[in-house]
Amino acid sequence: SEGSPENRICTNNCAGYKGCNYNCDTNIASYKSVCEGEFDPKCLR
């Protein structure tokens, strides 16, 4: 797992998709970052 303690990664509904773990912070940039550069609507669940 790549994730600094300062970036808490929350595994949520996206867990089954493409390793789509999203950051606890609701910043779109963070979503894009953890979603492997792909901004996917599933990441917003």
Curated annotation (Swiss-Prot):
SUPFAM superfamilies: Plant proteinase inhibitors
Subcellular location field: Secreted
GO molecular function: serine-type endopeptidase inhibitor activity
Annotated S-S bridges: 10-24, 14-35, 20-43
Swiss-Prot/TrEMBL keywords: Disulfide bond, Protease inhibitor, Secreted, Serine protease inhibitor
Site keyed Reactive bond for trypsin: positions: 32-33
Parts of the chain that traverse the membrane: none
GO cellular component, one term: extracellular region
Family: Belongs to the protease inhibitor I20 (potato type II proteinase inhibitor) family.
Functional description taken from the UniProt entry: Inhibits trypsin strongly and chymotrypsin temporarily.
Name this polypeptide is given: Proteinase inhibitor IIA
Species: Solanum tuberosum
